[in-house]
Structure formats: C-alpha cells, structure tokens
Amino acid sequence: HGTIDYIDEPAETLEWQRRTGKTIGTQGSNYLMYESIGIFRTQDDLDSYPHLSDARVGDVKFRDVNGDKKIDGDDKVRMDKPAVPEIMYGINLGTTYKNWSLNMLWQGAARVWQYTFMEAGIIGNFTKDFYDNRWTEDNPNAKYPRTYNRDATVTGGGNYRNSFWLNNASYLRLKSIELAYNCPKSWFKGTPISGVR
C-alpha cells in the first residue's frame, strides 16, 4: 500500500485527524475513532478524568488527545490499522522418505484489524466471553466494559466508535495437508498401470 500524498482537506483539520500521510485503503485513511485507554473502574475514576456526558462507570475511557479536559469530536484520531491485510503469504512445505511424501500448504495474513462487536442478532444477545468477563460492581477489574444498550452506548461503537473493539485479525492457518504413499512399481509388473499413489 502507498500513502496519501495529498487530499483536499479543510485547513482547520486537526493534525491527528488528517488523511494526508495515511496508508491508502486502510481504516486509518477512512475512519476517525476515539482512542481507548482503559475502562472507568470506579466512580472516582470517572469523576477525575474527562468523559462524554453520558459516560458511566464501567464504560470505555477515551484519551483526551488535545488536552482540553473534555472528550469531544476533536479527540478522535485516525487509526493506522488496516481492514485489508497489508501482508498475505503462503508457505508450501514438502518432504519425502522412501515411498512416503508429506506436503503442507500454510496460508496467512498480517497487519490486518477488524472492528468487532460483542453483541449479535437481537439486542442483548452478547457473546458468552463478553458476558462472563464484563464490568460489574462485583467485577470492577473485568476484561470488558459493562453491558450496553445498542442505541445509546459509549462502549459498543455507534456514535462513539472506538479502538477498544479494534482487534488484530492476523492469522496463520494450515490450508491443506497431504500424506501419500507411492506404491512400488514392482507391484504392477505385467499390467498397464505405471504407478499408484
């Protein structure tokens, strides 16, 4: 991927929100997001740090990028994390021993990110991992923020799209494997068969 050398942007566009200089074809060149810096674990935590007006304990905490002690649209940043893999690769490995052969094809993608939600289908249909590891008063050090209402949420995206839900989607998988045995030619003497594998 190349980078955007120039794009007609308003002069007042904040430096961290510009598309110029970002990688072509990535989320970083297309989307603005709040940068997650954790979860509001307690009321004191919420009261002592700038937050959106509807934020509650258990919500994702966003970075005050410009340091003005408030969280608003000026704090969104362009995330330089591509939705389309920047690196795709394959590895073909093979070995033989006597009449046996083993071949494997590995395939992978790297430097790719996916924006994921912990809710699917009807409202309130959360994944088990999210539900079991969400913030609650009894579990303030949870892995995930509190459960949320899809229509008014700080945690789940919507009007407050944020990097908490941006996950590395790089992978390496075994696409195919073949174990073969080459039957000795002596087995087929006197037949039109030249070999069987």
Residue positions per predicted region:
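Extended hydrophobic secondary-structure segments that form protein cores and membrane-embedded regions
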Residues: 1, 196-197
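Conserved small-residue
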Residues: 1-83
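Transmembrane beta-barrel strand/turn architecture of Gram-negative outer membrane proteins
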Residues: 1-33, 88-124, 177, 181-182
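Extracytoplasmic gating/loop element in the C-terminal half of outer-membrane beta-barrel translocons
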Residues: 29, 54-57, 109-195
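Glycine- and acidic
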Residues: 75-77, 86, 90, 159-166
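Generic recognition of flexible, low-complexity loop/linker segments
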Residues: 78-80, 89-92, 185-187
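Membrane-spanning beta-strand positions in outer-membrane beta-barrel proteins
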Residues: 101-105, 188, 197
